[in-house]
Swiss-Prot record:
Region (Disordered): 860-947
PROSITE patterns for the chain: SECA_MOTOR_DEAD
Coiled coil regions in record: none
Source lineage: Bacteria, Bacillati, Actinomycetota, Actinomycetes, Mycobacteriales
Protein name: Protein translocase subunit SecA
Length: 947
C-alpha cells in the first residue's frame, strides 16, 4: 500500500472529527424525550415536515439531529432496536461523506438507516450498495420496515428484473442493490433510444456497505456490456463460398508486403451477381464489404499450418516469431471468423464492447459517496486517493475482550488439518461454538469429511447459497455449533452468542407465510410476540456459550489480504462478548510458498521437529504480514493502472453520454445540424483544394463526392466559368466554399420541407434526433472496439522507450476526434439521403425503424414498454406523424453479455434473457429484397466510391 507517512498524514484531524461526531450523537440523544411522546402518526408526519422545511431552505445538516432522532425512535418501535451512541456517530460520519470504520457486530446495517432517511428527505434518491443480491433484498425488507413506518418507499434492484420493474425501484426514496446492478443500469441507460426507457434518475448519494470489498477488491475488474460485433455467421460462410470463384489479378489484387487487398470492378460485379443485389456499395449492403475483404484476406494472406493450425475443429493462431500455438487468442475485426468459414469449422461469434466503465469512475458520479466496513484502516490511503473518502474509526459500543492467539505453523498441510480437527473436537465437547474459515471449497469439504469421521455435527458454507448461509450463520453462535465456511461466506450476518434472534424470528414468520413486503401488516402484528419467544430461547443458551469462552474463530490459512483475515477474526467478540481466535498455517499454504516458505522449512528441518509439532514465532508472523503487504501493494498498482487507462475513456465517455442525453431530452438539433453541414462541406472543399491553383483542382471528383452527401444544386463548370477558353482562374477557395455552403444549406431547407410535408410540423427535428442517436451509437461502438484494439498492443511501445500510457492518451484522443468527424459526415449524409415514408402511428416515438434495415448490425439494450411512472415523466409534446426511415439501425433486442466482478473480485460473465427476435444481418433473401428497394443514394460515404 502507499507509504506509511501518507497513511499517518491522512489521520491528522481524525480526533477532531470523532469529537464532532460525539457532540452530534449527544445532541440527537437529548431529543429522545421529545420524539418518544409522539404517536406513530405524528412520527410519520415528521417526514413531511422535514421535506417542507428542506424545500423552504433548511439544509440537511441543520435537519440532521431531529431527523436522526425520529429515525432512531422508529427503529425502536418497529424492529425493537435503538441506535447506540456509536451508531449515531457512524450515521453522521456517513452523512458527511466518509467511510465509517465499525467493527463486525457493531450494527452497520442499522447505522445505515439514519443517513439514508435524512438524505431521502431531499427527494433525489438514496442508493445503498451491498455485496450480493441476498443482502440487498434482506436489508431492503428489514430496514424498509423502519422507512415505511416513516412514510418512505424502499425498493431493491435484483438481477433478472425487467427494465419496467427497475424504473419503479429507482423511483423509490431508498434503493438497495449490488454494485454490478447499479453500474450496468447506468450503462444500459446510455444505450437506450427513448427517455421512457431510462431507469435511473441521477446519482445523488450512495452508501456502500462493505466498502473495502466493493471499492477496493472488486475495482480491479471493470463493468463491460458486450454483444455480437456482427449479425450472423451465415455471411462468413457465404463469402467463403464466393472467395474461390474470385481470381487473383482479375477480380482483385494483393499486396503481400503490406498485407492488403483491393477489389477490382470485375470482382464487385461477380459478387453482386452471386448475391443477387444491384449495388454492393449502397447503404443496405455496406456491411457486406468487410465480409468480402476478410474472405479474400483469409484466402490469400493467411496460410494453414503457417499462420494458423486447425485442431479439434478450432482455428488456433501460430506465433510468427516463435512458432508456438497461441491457444485462446483470436484475430480481431471478423478475420478469425473468416478463416473459420474458409476451413469449414464452427464459426464462433465475435463479441464487441458496447459500453464499459470501471467501478471507480461509476462511484465518482455520485454527488456524495460514503461507506461502511469493519476493516478500512489498511486501505485508507487508497480510498482517499481514488475517491477522496476519509476513513473515520468509530469506537466500539463496549470494550473488545477477544483473545487473539499467535499463529501455529506446521510442516505439512495434513498435520495442520489433523491439529485443527483435534482442537475443534475438544472445544465442541466443551459446548463452545466454533467458526472455521478456509480459503477454498475443496478445503471446506476436506474438513467436513474429517468431522464426519469423528462424529461431529457441523454445517458447511461455500458462499454460493446466500439465503441458506444467513440462516446457518445466524445459528453459528449456539452452544457446540461447528460451522465450516470459506472466508468470504456469511458476510453481513452477525454471529450472535446463543443465536441471532432477529434472523431466527424472521425465518419463523416466513414459514407461516408472512413477510415484510407482501404482508407487512400481519408481519408487524406477529413480530413482537415471536421475537420475545425467540429471545427467551437464546438467552439461556447465550449464557452457556459465554461460560465456555464465547465464539472460537479458527483460520486454516492466511489470506493475501490482511482485511479478510481481520474480517474473519472480527466475527468473534462482538458487542463486548468473550471470544478467541487463532490461525493454523502450514509451509504448503499459498502465501507461505509465495514468500520464502523454504527458509522456514529448512529451520524446522534443522531443529528436527516432527510434522505434528508446530512452531509459534513472532518472526513468522512478521514475515506473513510483510508478504501480505507486498500482495496488497501489487493489487493496488493493478487497480491504479486500470484507473489510469480508464481515465482516458472516461473523458470521452462523459462527452458522448452528455451529448446523448441532450438528444434524448429533446434538445433542438437544428443549429447543430447547420454547423455540421458547414464543417463537413468545408472539409470536402479544403481537401479538394489543398494543393495547387484552380487549374489543378479536380472539381469533377469533388462534385462526385458531394453528390453522395447531398443533392448539389450548382454546376462546377458554371461556377468555375469553364468555356472554350478554359477555366476562370479568378475562382478562389473561399468563393468555392461559400457557394457550396449556401447551396448545401438551401438544400437542407428544401429537405426539411419535404419531411415536414410527410410528418407534419417538427418531423425533421424528430428525424434529426433519431439519426443522431443511431449514428452516435454505432460510431461509439466502433470507437470502443478500436480503443480495445489499441490497448491490447500499447504495452509494446515501452520497447521503443515510450510511455504506453502517454501513447494511449495521445492516440486515443486522435481516434476520438476522428470518430467525431465521421459522426458529422455520416449524420449529414443520412439526413439528406434517408428514404422516408408515412407509417402507422407508433405509441412510443415519432419515427419507427424498419426491420432488417440497411445499416451495420447493431446491439442495443432491450427496450421495455414504458411504465405508468415513466409515462408521467414524458414531456407531453405532440409527436409528429410516424415515419418509416430506411437505413437506420434496428433497435430490436440482442443478447448481451455482462462482465463484472464477483464477490472475490474476479471477472464473471452473465448473459441477459432478451429474446433473439431476429437476426441483425437478415437472411440472404431478405437482404436482396432490402437492397433492391433501397436507393443508391442512401449511403453516406466519406469520399468518392472507389472499387
Amino acid at each position: 500500500m502507499p507509504s506509511l507517512s501518507l497513511s499517518k498524514l491522512l489521520r491528522v484531524g481524525e480526533g477532531r472529527m470523532v469529537k464532532r461526531l460525539k457532540h452530534i450523537a449527544e445532541h440527537v440523544e437529548s431529543l429522545s424525550p421529545d420524539v418518544e411522546g409522539l404517536t406513530d402518526e405524528q412520527l410519520k408526519a415528521k417526514t413531511t415536515e422535514f421535506r417542507e422545511r428542506y424545500a423552504a431552505g433548511e439544509t440537511l445538516d441543520e435537519l440532521l439531529p431531529e431527523a436522526f432522532s425520529v429515525a432512531r425512535e422508529a427503529s425502536w418501535r418497529v424492529i425493537d432496536q435503538k441506535h447506540f451512541h456509536v451508531q449515531i456517530m457512524g450515521g453522521a460520519a456517513l452523512h458527511f461523506g466518509n467511510v465509517a470504520e465499525m467493527k463486525t457486530g457493531e450494527g452497520k446495517t442499522l447505522t445505515c438507516v439514519l443517513p439514508a432517511y435524512l438524505n431521502a428527505i431531499a427527494g433525489d434518491g438514496v442508493h445503498v450498495v451491498t455485496v450480493n443480491d441476498y443482502l440487498a433484498k434482506r436489508d431492503s425488507e428489514w430496514m424498509g420496515r423502519v422507512h415505511r413506518a416513516l412514510g418512505l418507499e424502499t425498493s431493491v434492484i435484483l438481477s433478472g428484473m425487467t427494465p419496467a420493474e427497475r424504473r419503479v425501484a429507482y423511483a423509490a426514496d431508498i434503493t438497495y442493490g449490488t454494485n454490478n446492478e447499479f453500474g450496468f443500469d447506468y450503462l444500459r441507460d446510455n444505450m437506450t433510444h427513448s427517455l421512457d426507457d431510462l431507469v435511473q434518475r441521477g446519482h445523488a448519494f450512495a452508501i456502500v456497505d462493505e466498502v473495502d470489498s466493493i471499492l477496493i477488491d472488486e475495482a480491479r475488474t471493470p463493468l463491460i456490456i458486450s454483444g455480437p460485433a456482427d449479425g450472423s455467421s451465415k455471411w462468413y460462410s457465404e463469402f467463403a463460398r464466393i472467395a474461390p470463384l474470385l481470381k487473383k489479378d482479375v477480380h482483385y489484387e494483393v499486396d503481400i508486403r503490406k498485407r492488403t487487398i483491393g477489389v477490382h470492378e470485375a470482382g464487385v460485379e461477380l459478387v453482386e451477381d452471386q448475391l443477387g443485389i444491384d449495388n454492393l456499395y449502397e447503404a443496405a449492403n455496406s456491411p457486406l464489404v468487410s465480409y468480402l475483404n476478410n474472405a479474400i484476406k483469409a484466402k490469400e494472406l493467411y496460410t494453414k499450418d503457417k499462420d494458423y493450425i486447425v485442431r479439434d475443429g478450432e482455428v488456433i493462431i501460430v506465433d510468427e516469431f516463435t512458432g508456438r500455438v497461441l491457444v485462446g487468442r483470436r484475430y480481431n475485426e471478423g478475420m478469425h471468423q473468416a478463416i473459420e468459414a474458409k476451413e469449414k469449422v464452427e464459426i464462433k461469434a465475435e463479441n464487441q464492447t458496447l459500453a464499459t466503465i470501471t467501478l471507480q469512475n461509476y462511484f465518482r458520479l455520485y454527488d456524495k459517496l460514503s461507506g461502511m466496513t469493519g476493516t478500512a484502516e489498511t486501505e485508507a490511503a487508497e480510498l482517499h486517493q481514488t475517491y477522496t473518502l476519509g476513513v473515520i474509526p468509530i469506537p466500539t459500543n463496549r470494550p473488545m475482550v477477544r483473545v487473539d492467539n499467535g499463529d501455529l505453523i506446521y510442516k505439512t498441510e495434513e498435520a495442520k488439518f489433523d491439529a485443527v480437527v483435534d482442537d475443534v473436537v475438544e472445544r465442541h465437547e466443551n459446548g463452545q461454538p466454533v467458526l472455521i474459515g478456509t480459503t477454498s471449497v475443496e478445503r471446506s469439504e476436506y474438513l467436513s469429511k474429517q468431522f464426519t469421521k469423528r462424529g461431529v455435527a457441523h454445517n458447511v458454507l461455500n458462499a454460493k447459497f446466500h439465503e441458506k448461509e444467513a440462516t446457518i450463520i445466524a445459528e453459528a453462535g449456539r452452544s457446540g455449533a461447528v460451522t465450516v465456511a470459506t472466508n468470504m461466506a456469511g458476510r453481513g450476518t452477525d454471529v450472535v452468542l446463543g443465536g441471532n434472534p432477529d434472523i431466527i424470528a424472521d425465518i419463523a414468520l416466513r414459514k407461516k407465510g408472512l413477510d415484510p413486503v407482501t404482508t407487512p401488516d400481519e408481519y408487524e402484528a406477529a413480530w413482537d410476540a415471536v421475537l420475545d419467544e425467540v429471545k427467551a430461547e437464546v438467552k439461556a443458551d447465550a449464557e452457556k456459550v459465554r461460560d465456555a469462552g464465547g465464539l472460537y474463530v479458527l483460520g486454516t490459512e492466511r489470506h493475501e489480504s490482511r482485511r479478510i483475515d481481520n474480517q474473519l477474526r472480527g466475527r468473534s467478540g462482538r458487542q463486548g462478548d468473550p471470544g478467541e481466535s487463532r490461525f493454523y498455517l502450514s509451509l504448503g499454504d499459498e502465501l507461505m510458498r509465495r514468500f520464502n516458505g523454504s527458509a522456514l522449512e529448512s529451520i524446522m528441518t534443522r531443529l528436527n521437529l516432527p510434522d505434528d509439532v508446530p512452531i509459534e514465532a513472532k518472526m513468522v508472523s512478521k514475515a506473513i504480514k510483510s508478504a501480505q503487504t507486498q500482495v496488497e501493494q501489487q493489487n493496488f498498482e493493478i487497480r491504479k493502472n486500470v484507473l489510469k487507462y480508464d481515465e482516458v475513456m472516461n473523458q470521452q465517455r462523459t462527452v458522448i453520454y452528455k451529448e446523448r442525453r441532450q438528444i434524448l431530452e429533446g434538445e433542438d438539433m437544428e443549429g447543430q445540424v447547420e454547423q455540421m453541414i458547414t464543417d463537413v462541406v468545408t472539409a470536402y472543399v479544403d481537401g479538394a483544394t489543398a494543393e495547387g491553383y484552380v487549374e489543378d483542382w479536380d472539381l469533377e471528383q469533388l462534385w462526385t463526392a458531394l453528390k453522395t452527401l447531398y443533392p448539389v444544386g450548382i454546376d462546377h463548370k458554371t461556377l468555375a466559368g469553364e468555356d472554350g477558353a478554359g477555366i476562370n482562374s479568378d475562382l478562389s477557395r473561399d468563393d468555392l466554399r461559400t457557394a457550396l455552403l449556401e447551396d448545401a444549406h438551401a438544400a437542407y431547407k428544401k429537405r426539411e420541407a419535404e419531411i415536414d410535408a410527410i410528418a407534419g410540423e417538427n418531423g425533421m427535428r424528430e428525424l434529426e434526433r433519431r439519426v443522431f442517436l443511431s449514428v452516435l451509437d454505432r460510431k461509439w461502438r466502433e470507437h470502443l472496439y478500436e480503443m480495445d484494439y489499441l490497448k491490447e498492443g500499447i504495452g509494446l511501445r515501452a520497447m521503443a522507450q515510450r510511455d504506453p500510457l502517454v501513447e494511449y492518451q495521445r492516440e486515443g484522443y486522435d481516434m476520438f476526434i476522428g470518430m467525431l468527424d465521421g459522426l458529422k459526415e455520416e449524420s449529414v449524409g443520412f439526413l439528406f439521403n434517408l428514404q422516408v415514408e408515412a407509417a402507422p402511428a407508433q405509441p412510443a416515438s415519432g419515427i419507427s425503424v424498419t426491420a432488417g434495415s440497411a445499416a451495420a448490425a447493431s446491439a442495443t439494450a432491450p427496450k421495455p414498454l414504458p411504465t405508468q411512472e415513466a409515462a408521467a415523466r414524458t414531456t407531453g409534446t405532440a409527436a409528429p406523424t410516424a415515419l418509416r426511415a430506411k437505413g437506420l439501425d434496428d433497435e430490436g433486442p440482442s443478447r448481451l453479455t455482462y462482465t463484472g466482478p464477483d464477490e472475490d473480485g474476479k471477472a464473471k460473465a452473465t448473459r441477459d434473457s432478451a429474446a433473439d427476435s431476429g437476426d441483425g444481418a437478415a437472411s440472404r433473401r431478405e437482404r436482396r429484397e432490402a437492397a433492391r428497394t433501397q436507393s443508391k443514394s442512401n449511403r453516406a460515404p466519406k469520399s468518392k466510391r472507389k472499387r
